[in-house]
């Protein structure tokens, strides 16, 4: 992924990740309920998007930290991004039950 493609702030990226994590859980559940392979594909697409967003957050946070103290303060942001990514991966695991 090219970071030039993502011109959002870290806050905007985290908000996007939160929104996508909500959608992906709903899609994964619906894919099971309706036995829908189309929904499984949408889950996979969102998973890929979440990976890109997580990467963008990591790079932006690393670039923002100038001192050890700032790095410690920014580590929480990385934990939030990782948590959203875990939600997406777990939803992907649920959707894989269809395959």
Q: For each predicted feature, which ranges?
A:
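Cytosolic, long alpha-helical scaffolding segments
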Residues: 1-99
